[in-house]
């Protein structure tokens, strides 16, 4: 029987995270590196990637590499797994984290519904959902070969519940339709692909609640008042979830959506 530390260890495995230079992505990469993995930072610009790669190498003494790619280009996204294997020798864990989020500065995005644009809707679905399809499809042969293949898709509470617009009243904030639709798609694609790729590859999702990013104090107060844990999330709240789903601690878990939202969605 394996012990807890052995099941949790990612030693000898390679983990890649899209959106890896961002707040949540870099936190997840550090957690995976601490658990023993070598890591690959995937993001849109090399200038964002390189500092994260250097920091992880220095902090954890592991191998770390970076790949710059625009996930709006699905063909480019599909080349990522091959590049990872060429540089790192293998691919065991894929965390699909990159996304346009509610605060992304897109035209026709963070607007009342009537002013949200079809073009931005299409862009969001391409990055938030189509890129996950392309990456999963291209990564599948390598993840099967690993013997420990795990995919973790990052969804959102707005993929499982409708928005409470009372949170946004009187503020220059909104809740884009394309964000909710794409994240709902992530949850269902997780279920679908978990049955298609089993038993060699496990596929699960993490659904984060709202993360504190110095939002308007009125929004923060409203959000916290309707959350049982009485606070917004912090990046470190997701460390346990990603290591659990990436590692053999969850070796009999697939097709699941782990909701980490402080109870926001249980009302």
Regions found by a protein language model. Give the residues of each.
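Amphipathic alpha-helical dimer-interface segment in Rossmann-like NAD(P)H-dependent oxidoreductases
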Residues: 123-147, 158-159, 191-199, 247
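Catalytic Tyr-X3-Lys loop
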Residues: 100, 114-133, 152, 179, ...
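Short, small/polar-rich loop/turn modules that mediate ligand/substrate recognition or access, typified
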Residues: 95, 148, 198-202, 253-255
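Canonical Rossmann dinucleotide-binding motif of NAD(H)/NADP(H)-dependent dehydrogenases/reductases
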Residues: 7-40, 193
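Conserved glycine-rich Rossmann-like NAD(P)H-binding loop of the short-chain dehydrogenase/reductase
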Residues: 36-51
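Substrate-binding pocket helix/loop in short-chain dehydrogenase/reductase
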Residues: 105-113, 117-122, 175, 223
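Catalytic loop of short-chain dehydrogenase/reductase
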Residues: 118-120, 144, 152-185, 190-195, ...
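Short C-terminal tail/terminal secondary-structure segment
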Residues: 2-7, 163, 170, 243, ...
